Structures are given as C-alpha cells and as structure tokens.
Amino acid sequence: MTSPTSLDQLKQQIKIAPIVEHYAIKLKKKGKDFVALCPFHADQNPSMTVSVAKNIFKCFSCQVGGDGIAFIQKIDQVDWKTALNKALSILNLDSQYAVNFYLKEVDPKLKRYWDLHSALVDYYQTRLKLEPKEQGLTYLTETRKLSPQVIERFQLGLAFTLEDQYFLPSLLNYPWISPAIEKAELCFATEKFPEALGFFNQQTHYATFKSRIMIPIHDLKGNPVGFSGRALQKTEKIKYKNSAEHQWFKKSELLFNFHRIDKNTLKLYLVEGYFDVFALTSAGIGDVVGLMGLALSESHIIAFQQQLKALETVVLALDNDTAGHDATFKLLQELNAHGIIVEVVDWNQAAYKDWDELFLAEGSDAVKAKTHRVLNLVEYLVAYFKTKGFDERITVNKVIDIIAQNQKVTADTSFSRFLCQKLQQLLQYSDVETLFTQLQQQKLKVKVNKTTTFTQRAPIYESVVGVVDNSFRNESQPVAITKEFLVENNWKETKERVFHAEIFAYVLLDKQFLVELKQSDLDELFASLQTPLFDVALFIDKARLYWAKVQEPDWAVFNSILGEQQAMFPTTFLAQIKEFFLNKSLSYDPEDYEEDLQFFRQLIVKQKELLKYFKSMVEH
C-alpha cells in the first residue's frame, strides 16, 4: 500500500464494499452499484446502496451514509480512531504511516477533549471530598438522600464557591495529564483553540460553574464529554447549567448513564432527569437511562440495536406532568415502530411529579414498587385515547394501527392475539377474532417498498405474559407484496375511508346535527363548501327530499335517501388513479400514488373542520 499524502488518498484505499461484507451483510449487484439490507434500521427490503465508484454507502430510508470509516463508526458505535484501525485491519492494510500521520492530525483533538474532561471529573470529585460537607456533600446525602455508593458510581463532584479564584491554578497544575493543561483550553473558544471548553472567562475572571453539584456526562461509549451543574442555592434562577454545545457534546445525541447499562439487559427504563436516574439506581434498578431532552434521535435507536442486542422492552418512565405524558406517546410510537416492546409506568394519579420526588418522600422501596406497576402497549393506549375523548371504534382503529407498526409484534401470532384480547376486554368492543383479523389486515398496509416479505420471528409472547396454551398458534406464511398489491390495497383503503358512514360528505362526527338541519338552513350553510370532492347541489337536493317526506329527524331514513356511497362522490376519480398506476410501467415508486390518494384524505379533513365551524355558527 502506497503511503497516502492526503486524507482523500487514505479514504480511497479504505474500500467500502469489503468493509460492509465483513459484517455479514450480503451485497446484491444492481447496475454499477450494490444494494443491501440496511443494518441501521429495521429494513425488510434492500434500501442501502453501496457505490464502489464513489466508495460510499447510503441508505435512502434512514438517510445514514458515509465512507468505510463512517460505516464502522455507526455499526460499532466507536470513535474515529478505533474505526480507522479496524478498517485497516479488515482490509489487511499495513499503514503505520497513515495511522501515525492522520491520527495526529485529526483524532488527537478528540482524545485531548476526553482527557481534559477526565481531569475535570477528577478535580470536581476531589473538591467534593475535600471541602467542608456543608459546601456540597451534605446536600447530596441529606437533602437528596443519596448514598456514598451512588455518589461514587456517578462520579458526582463539586464546583465550590471560590472557583473564580482556585479553578485555573488547580487545573493548570493538574499532574495526571500530558501535555499539561493550557489556560486557553479551559477558557472560551478562540481561533487558536476552537475546541476550548468554556469553563472560565478570561475577561471577567469568572468560572462558569460554581456553587453547583457537577454531574459528568459521557458519550454512548463512556468517554466524558461534558457536565451538568445542579445549583446548590435555591435562589439561583438557573437550576441546571450545562456545558456549551460542541461538536463532541450534543445533548440530543446523548443518553445519561447509557455506558453503564448491562449490555445483556432485557429491559431498559427511560426517565427524564439525572436525579430520576439516581432515584431508580438507589432502588436497585441499574438499567436506567436519562433523556437529555424529550426525544430520541436516530443515534439512540442505533445504540439500542447495536449495543443492547438482547433488549426486548423499554419502559417509559417519564415525568408525571403534561410534557412527560405528551413525550411518552411520541416516544412509544417511535420505539414501537423500531420493533421494541414498550411498557409505560402507571402513575395512576400519583401526587408526585417524578421519581426524585417519590424517592425523597417515600424512599427507595416505594420507587421499586412503582417501577413494577406498568401498563402494556394496549393498556396505555386505551387510557391515553380515553383522555382525548375518542369513542370505542376510533380507539380500536388507532390502537390496532399502532400495533401494526411493530413488525416484531405482528410476526408473533400469540402476542398479537394476546394484545387483541386485552383490547377487547378493556373496551368491550367487537370480539377477539374480528380484532385479530383487523390487525392482520392492517399490518399489510404498513408502508413498505416495492417488494418485501414478512416472516415469522422468534416468539416474544412467553417472555411478556408467561407460558400459555399455544395450540391455536398458526405459523405465518411469507406474503409477497407486489406493485399490484400495493396499488389495489391502498386504493381500497382510501375508498373505504372516504365512504365510511361517519366521515362521508357532511355526516362526519355528528349525524344528529345534520338530520336536524331544516330545509331553510341548507342553502346558506353549504353555499361556500364547493370542493371537487362531491356535488354540493346534489347533496342539497337529497336533503330537501328527506324533509319533504319526513317531518321528524330520523337518521336511517335520511341515510337511505342520501344514497350513502352513491350520492355525490365521483368514484371514477379513484378508479382512474388506480388504473393509472397499475398500468404505469416506468419509474414506478410506491409513494407516487400515495400523494394522489392523500389528496382525497385532505379533503375529508377539510370537511370535518368546516362542519365543526358551521355547527358552532348554528348553535350560537
């Protein structure tokens, strides 16, 4: 191998195709490139392209891409240096020159960043131990009731009141780092030191952190990358002060305590705050991570999939407030769509806002007991949609739609049936077989690319609900999803939705309101509702016919006179769209017809909004 003289030359020598194949990913030739199942999301149809000419990979579903080094970084969740070394090893490239030269130029900055933070962790921990207890240790042990073991486990430290005076001299004389720390590295970023940490202001001579408990934050591999400082004084307006955002410290890409999780864990608890993590840890729940915000990023999902390979269940245990409840529903949908079983802690109108409050009020036993009170997917969703005021039919449809997004669940017949049983029991709606059939139909409507196959996966039912009689289990047969199936299925789905009795024309959500409209109200009420979706004049004629024959409101009669599915909707529009895409042979993409059919759904939404508006006008 010729020693490279530029970064581009080094990357050219690290070929992408053999690196991808090293991870047992099968490449299939497609033109000049290769395609493969993407390892970074639940890919059922090859959506990752590997370009030999460009020496890169790109997934057009999850948008992950890059060169060979980036691929290793993503799949192994390692830093650039480790990925480079592994790439050279995979390709049997002897390039000590490349390692020495380029790691000095690129990677040492990141390594230095970690080393500086390690020194800071050590410094703040030492401060906590050396300063009088009332400066910080008393706050942790008495006010926050944390044990010495928890304090040590999380490397908690203290930025004491005199940091303005002692911070710089202490760090500049810190002996366990080479080369020695420079003042500019600790101050705010400059042109010479763009990676400076921002812990001291040279102009004002003020330390960024003082009178705060310092909580070290690590990246997903356990390297220290930042801090969050918890104010000790109640008068301090800013309760938590974090390290400045940096290319290596992006809160949205981090999970507090992730690097300490048992990599063979089956269940992971997801909470909001640092002290919530401390509360669960104090109660003996070690596999708990804290969100650095209220959202999960793609890097979080990849970390779950790549580093927690045995993970089956994520328990959402966010705060018991409006923001926590809203975030729970969003996170549930995201995790569920990635094939993760989701449970939700049942706060059950508890008086406490979060785990820290519960821990301080009732202790670790109460925390541990609460972690065992969880709702499964269906139990949570039924309760959630009830708070939104949805009736049983709408709730069933929404719950089944969410279940159908999880291919791991729908591939397990027993678990799917169990969830349908729970849904029927909670709502006393329909019957189990009907709901199960609806779920099977809905899972086929989940968006897929041109051709894919659903196959039976390893059973998960027993691990969740115990051993049961599985005699009724039927092994799933592969179902080929073709272009014709997609078009036909989506057309039928759209047609059913626009013709459904409760959203058809102006029937929508309030049948009685429409029936009670007098003939004199019709012209004014519907005059402005001209849309290409239906024939307004024909609707008015039908309504007048009803009032001419019937003097008392009667929905059944009104419905029959209206003619339901034949009165006003131009069915030929949908039929033409269906025929167009079935006959279309070039440049076919499943999303093409979706945009056209979505037009009709948007009109339905518009009808609902208009109905609500006009109803309010009539009532007032």
From Swiss-Prot:
GO cellular-component term (any): cytoplasm
Classification via Gene3D superfamilies: 3.40.1360.10, DNA primase, catalytic core, N-terminal domain, Zinc finger, CHC2-type domain
Domain of life of the native organism: Bacteria
Cofactor(s) needed by this chain: Zn(2+); Mg(2+)
Entry keywords, A to Z: DNA replication, DNA-binding, DNA-directed RNA polymerase, Magnesium, Metal-binding, Nucleotidyltransferase, Primosome, Transcription, Transferase, Zinc, Zinc-finger
A single MF term (Gene Ontology): DNA binding
EC number(s) per entry: 2.7.7.101
PROSITE patterns: TOPRIM
ZnF bounds (CHC2-type): 38-62
Keyword Transcription on entry: yes
Binding site for Mg(2+) 2: D319, D321
Domain Toprim: 266-350
The record's free-text note on cofactor binding: Binds 1 zinc ion per monomer.
Reaction catalyzed: ssDNA + n NTP = ssDNA/pppN(pN)n-1 hybrid + (n-1) diphosphate
GO terms of biological process kind: DNA replication, synthesis of primer
Binding site for Mg(2+) 1: E272, D319
Enzyme class: transferase
Subunit structure: Monomer. Interacts with DnaB.
Domain remarks: Contains an N-terminal zinc-binding domain, a central core domain that contains the primase activity, and a C-terminal DnaB-binding domain.
PANTHER family membership: DNA PRIMASE
Function statement: RNA polymerase that catalyzes the synthesis of short RNA molecules used as primers for DNA polymerase during DNA replication.
Family designation: Belongs to the DnaG primase family.
Protein name, entry field: DNA primase
Organism encoding this protein: Mycoplasma pneumoniae (strain ATCC 29342 / M129 / Subtype 1)
Lineage: Bacteria, Bacillati, Mycoplasmatota, Mycoplasmoidales, Mycoplasmoidaceae
Gene: dnaG
